[in-house]
Amino acid sequence: IPHLLIDKRYNFLQVHQQILLFHESLGGNSPTVHPYCAAWYKWPLLTRPMAYLYETATSLKEPLPVVGPPLPKGFGQVIYDVHAMGNPFLWWFGVIALILLLVMLGWQAVSFLVKKKRFALTPILSVDTWITLYLVLNYAANLLPWVGVTRCLFIYHYMTAVVFAFMAIAWFVDQCLGSYYKLLRAVGVTITFMILTAFVFWLPLYLALPLSPHGYKLRMWFSSWI
């Protein structure tokens, strides 16, 4: 790893220990430090995303002001907003999928212990079990280190963990679509449709596409999102 050759005081593990200690030594995880501070437990449910841009204009033809004060509140008829927030349905379904995976692992662990006591079976893990372990352990490994951090955190610190939540819902949907049961296939299709629809619905907040005040309010489902 190139950067380890530049500073040889720390090895690979020590570098990450220093990074974690740096974050743990900083305090001030509250809105008084920054309005968009979001503790780690707010990330999974997307309760506090982050606004990067908010500008208003009187019409679509009017260029956005590069410098200068914004228009008075309620005066602009067109809103341009960029939010650092994920697709809410993808986010929430991912958390549900992880919970289901945890339940599956717990059930398999209990079943294995019961069968082992009765029949002395050797442990053989299925491919699905390995996938479940991979997703749950990697999600936990990327989220739990932030539990002890007291500095001002933001939603983007969750990016390395949420990837595994996305993979969890993708795996769950794949299982549903490949099921023999019509109801499960319908669940898989419904989840996919809801995620795609939500992406299109919230796309203006990702790309700063023009919105009316009413359209902006429709997308701000919770006051903590603003």
Where on the chain are the PLM-derived regions?
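Hydrophobic/aromatic-rich transmembrane helices and adjacent perimembrane loops
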Residues: 153-174
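Membrane-interface anchor segments at the N-terminal boundary of transmembrane helices
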Residues: 52-131
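Alpha-helical transmembrane segments
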Residues: 115-121, 149-151, 172-182
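Hydrophobic, membrane-inserted alpha-helices
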Residues: 138-146
